[in-house]
Amino acid sequence: MKIKVLGSAAGGGFPQWNCYCRNCQGVRDGSIAATARTQSSIAVSDNGRDWVLCNASPDICHQIAANPELHQPGVLRGSAIGSIILTDSQIDHCTGLLNLREGCPHQVWCTPEVHADLTSGFPIFTMLQHWNGGLVHHAIQPARSFSVAVCPSLRFTAIPILSNAPPYSPFRGRPLPGHNIALMIEDTASGSRLLYAPGLGEPDAPLLELMSQADCLLIDGTLWQDNELANTGVGRNTGRDMGHLALGEERGLMTLLGELPAARKILIHINNTNPILDGSSDERLALTARGIEVSYDGMSIEL
């Protein structure tokens, strides 16, 4: 299995266009050991030629341009992306579908709850009906496995996770099980397993059991502290409000990851305020000491 990290930042990217916190200003002027990052999405493949896009970032066009693996030379118009899977209906994971309208129809896999959000409060499916067939919905049922034709050796299993519905959803603060899923992606040819969870509020016992079975974890690294936005002076929401378990809290995600046997533990969906973006920070060094990696745009992983 081949995995390509197309974007590694949380919503707004890094630096965020209107933010001048220490991190954002530091990456602009070079005063911290950091690199710019686009908003979170990955692509996976069983052969390195055909790809499944997992989440469609607002930066997807730039991400495709920056990753030749996703190009399809030799045709007048085309893409190596054959299917799209959405793990939630958050704006930073779905807006890129609008930017891909020239390639419609697209095969899009998501839960009924996500599809409902994307046909009502943020009606991308409805809008794109006017572009060559739009988005063809394939329903994901939580806790059930499925495959896609473009990568037949990959088996995807949707795992309901504790997080939150997006701010525009009527289910904000009271999400249903299908509003947020992790994906267990298994290469049936090699047996290797990736667990992808870019939005993770609280790992429960069933999820921790599945995380212990994965060879690689690609996990939500949004915040270091639960009250990080308030401490930085840029917002009031806590990580838990937004559906993210902070890394550095007591029994936070860093501690949990340190107890799991996966050969690789990699963070994705990193907010612009998170000190781990500075490669020389104490927080980054603490992760490194525990064998936890921080993903970056263009990162290639092979299992």
UniProtKB/Swiss-Prot annotation:
May be involved in the transport of PQQ or its precursor to the periplasm. HAMAP family: PQQ_syn_PqqB. Belongs to the PqqB family. Disulfide bonds: none annotated. Keywords: PQQ biosynthesis, Transport. This is Coenzyme PQQ synthesis protein B. Pfam families: Lactamase_B_2. It comes from the Bacteria. Pathway: Cofactor biosynthesis; pyrroloquinoline quinone biosynthesis. Gene3D superfamilies: Ribonuclease Z/Hydroxyacylglutathione hydrolase-like. One of its GO terms (biological process) is pyrroloquinoline quinone biosynthetic process.
